[in-house]
Amino acid sequence: MANILRKVIENDKGELRKLEKIAKKVESYADQMASLSDRDLQGKTLEFKERYQKGETLEQLLPEAFAVVREAAKRVLGLFPYRVQIMGGIVLHNGDVPEMRTGEGKTLTATMPVYLNAIAGEGVHVITVNEYLSTRDATEMGEVYSWLGLSVGINLAAKSPAEKREAYNCDITYSTNSEVGFDYLRDNMVVRQEDMVQRPLNFALVDEVDSVLIDEARTPLIVSGAVSSETNQLYIRADMFVKTLTSVDYVIDVPTKTIGLSDSGIDKAESYFNLSNLYDIENVALTHFIDNALRANYIMLLDIDYVVSEDGEILIVDQFTGRTMEGRRFSDGLHQAIEAKEGVRIQEESKTSASITYQNMFRMYKKLAGMTGTAKTEEEEFREVYNMRIIPIPTNRPIARIDHTDLLYPTLESKFRAVVEDVKTRHAKGQPILVGTVAVETSDLISRKLVEAGIPHEVLNAKNHFKEAQIIMNAGQRGAVTIATNMAGRGTDIKLGEGVRELGGLCVIGTERHESRRIDNQLRGRSGRQGDPGESQFYLSLEDDLMRRFGSDRIKAFLDRMKLDEEDTVIKSGMLGRQVESAQKRVEGNNYDTRKQVLQYDDVMREQREIIYANRRDVITANRDLGPEIKAMIKRTIDRAVDAHARSNRKDAIDAIVTFARTSLVPEESISAKELRGLKDDQIKEKLYQRALAIYDQQLSKLRDQEAIIEFQKVLILMIVDNKWTEHIDALDQLRNAVGLRGYAQNNPVVEYQAEGFKMFQDMIGAIEFDVTRTMMKAQIHEQERERASQRATTAAPQNIQSQQSANTDDLPKVERNEACPCGSGKKFKNCHGRKSFS
């Protein structure tokens, strides 16, 4: 262990020597930059851009560019970055994390790499943990960037898409981590390119990087919507409809367990739901409900595929074990369809439309860097997950803070009495005190005790970021007492008031140890900024959460040996510190394992998400005929349908293929079993494909022009992809919950999730292509366009149109609803001029 530690220290020292060498080169430009006029210094930005365009790298520009920012900061802000800040800036440019202590000027440090990377013109995102810090930093540091000719934008949650787009198009964009993530997800849900707000993700510099990439890594960003009661009503209506069908109205393919409406079933659906054409593009969602209702009623069998529990819950039956699968639900809306079939309550769920973890969100940037005062304890995770090194940067001045040994008490009550007594003593002499707590409840408890003791104080628990910063800024004033949860006020320095240095500086009192050593170090670091005096003292009790969960038995035994009888007895021991640190390391290890597992699961989703989003973006940005892509989908759909029956009895296989063709591909009368008999599978595939291409061309010929064709193709694909992707996300969530239980059966749940998730993804792709094929072949495009033309004409001359419709209807001969329309369109009368009569 000692050898490893020595090697790490030597590596850090070697890295610092390299950084110092580059920093000295930056400093060598100081006199040259100081001699430039404002105009000449500002002109450097354009010069750097031109040099970059001609082939110079950012690394080659770094010394001079950093020197320009230093001089600009001195002229605009009156601040001149120190050498250690230059070193921190170099680390950031390299895509790593400089560990810089509180008060060492991380915000100013960031200006140098942000400016340098903005020169490339691809956008730089400065990420903060809340909107107050985004606004503050963009306003303060934005003065330097604007002075140097770069544009600065602030991305806030309340902004409109147009305002967000403007912010993202700036050279430098300030935003919170959550808003960048949500904007990414929303960009991949829009249907028009002009509705997207983000540019490709280039360089992100994350402030308080440990908070964003470590502490929040377990919580995914989710865009979801509650499933409305109207949706549940559609499940019920679809169920009521399919219960009216007879065996001639649907066709079951036994080998593949699929089902579809026959022509008579389609007629009944159009009549039941008052539709002109069931497979029009706007009816995609309805056909999904009907398909599920068909499966629920005629494929899924009670007490074989599922059971109904005593409390009315649908439970899936494992086909291999015969046991019910608690917590599992059929995906793609089938479970709700079965609930409608059995007349039990349809469980309302919020449906996830898109999700991503911060881990995978920020790994999409070309380059990622971050700043924090406490990251070394998480170095392994930063390296393994984000490929980022942690480089400790020396302080500009030596640390003068005194960190006292922890004090341990037998009970919570005795500990809190000691805390209040310490606060009272220090407050009496005017020393400012920051009391750090792990939970809001503890803050409130200590506040009540201080009120009882007559000590005025402020309570801060991260509920109001703007008020929070103001309170923290005043926490270093003489006589100030501030109670704060450990994370409250991060990003805002506590500056000492007049006369406070002589009183010992700010005293930080920790009321218990956090699970993470890093959080404790952050609390300590609120005191002693930039070489200021300060103190830190932690109070612990055997009843603290961390002590109860880890190591308390050993400490209790130690106390028993000490024969401590008094409740208020305090003990100081080196063993105590080692025990606490050991407990924290165990918790940190457990938390890292949890985050690593979250990432392993999300990596499966990531690969699939990237495929879907890339294809989706290709469709949105395409200014071309998407016919080749749709034809390829039709071809694969036909191939799958034919291959599914390759091992069936030949007669049954031909019948099933004909049924597929009639329900999903071509008009019923245009295909028969007779013409397919005697053909090999490849010949059948080719015949069906050629028939489908003819229908495809007929469909598109009904659209008015090439622009309308492209728009129709885009809407068709996007509607179906989005519907299936949303269902797939839901299915993956359910799968993840289910495979977690398999760990008890000695199976690796992540491996099973990967395997089953991949198969589900392939199935989803097949379902997308099937729905695109069926909708493309069956959509009544002519009718849709005719109605649009009618609506346009109605706007111009409503009276003439109305009279014309009446005349046309009156002049029609007596025709049965399923006969060909006499107008010559080739459609059934009910779907053409007779449609109004049967509405």
Curated annotation (Swiss-Prot):
Its EC number is 7.4.2.8. Keywords: ATP-binding, Cell membrane, Cytoplasm, Membrane, Metal-binding, Nucleotide-binding, Protein transport, Translocase, Translocation, Transport, Zinc. It is a peripheral membrane protein. One of its GO terms (biological process) is protein transport by the Sec complex. May bind 1 zinc ion per subunit. Gene3D superfamilies: Helical scaffold and wing domains of SecA, P-loop containing nucleotide triphosphate hydrolases, SecA, preprotein cross-linking domain. It comes from the Bacteria. Zn(2+) binds at residues 821, 823, 832-833. Residues 780-790 have a biased composition (Basic and acidic residues). Residues 827-839 have a biased composition (Basic residues). One of its GO terms (molecular function) is protein-exporting ATPase activity. It is found in: Cell membrane; Cytoplasm. Its main location: membrane. One of its GO terms (cellular component) is cytosol. Part of the Sec protein translocase complex. Interacts with the SecYEG preprotein conducting channel. Has a central role in coupling the hydrolysis of ATP to the transfer of proteins into and across the cell membrane, serving as an ATP-driven molecular motor driving the stepwise translocation of polypeptide chains across the membrane. Monomer and homodimer. Part of the essential Sec protein translocation apparatus which comprises SecA, SecYEG and auxiliary proteins SecDF. Other proteins may also be involved. Belongs to the SecA family. This is Protein translocase subunit SecA. The lineage of its organism: Bacteria, Bacillati, Bacillota, Bacilli, Lactobacillales.
